[in-house]
Amino acid sequence: KIKVINMGPSAEGHPFLVTIISSEENINNLDKLQKINKMLTDPRGIEESLIAPLIEEGKAVVCQSMSLHASEVGGTQMTPELTHDLLTRTDSETQRILDNVIFVMVPCLNPDGQVMITDWYRETVGTDYEGLSMPWLYHKYSGHDNNRDGDYHNLVESKYMAQTIFVDWLPQAYIDHHHMGSTGARFFVPPYCDPIRPYADPLVWREISWYGAHIAYKLEEQGFKGILNAAQFAGWGHFGWHWITPFHNIAGMLTESAGVNYATPIYIQPEQLR
């Protein structure tokens, strides 16, 4: 049910991993399904009569990436549990996902930073510096601005990411998981607020709204509160991964979880929320 691909070394030599999770049958037929997905992504030259059978045989491709910003630790720290759930759960919903979706996951888009942040936290836990920002950049060349490299691909990690989502897999939907401040909403999901860039296909923006509404609905159905959408984060931003993907016909989405102090608990009083 899982395939792990080492795309190569990061800027400082750590492995950049891509994991693919789906049903056992889909994993065994991954090359064929990848070919079908590429044909449907760019159907020029394919006979019209072949399109419907390809759609019937193909699978949805969804990509998610975690912790591009290394201090936003929740994404990467969550991936082992998510992977375990998808591989071991036997309920009908999980099986439906595995049967119909090829899930392409980048468990850490900045492996160097993740190692730095982990080392920094372990060094400072129990001291006055516990939970404070690391006093150097968590990427050798770009620091926090690695999220501005979704178009030029200057960083080797960006090259691996572009290879994954623009060449190898071309997903129908993509989510880039981040953290925001601690005293606002608990979780942001699309749709973005206005303005949005007008140059992508309008249907992609509508798909983003549909995905985000479904995520919010499922969370609130389970009793989660503080879900925000259509506010705070506009659809007109720098060309990071979630904002450049709509121009590749991919429903690119950002999530922002309420911020944390690494593994140290934080306490938010009701009057602090705004």
Segments and roles (model prediction):
Residues 1-274:
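Structured catalytic-domain cores with a bias toward divalent-metal coordination
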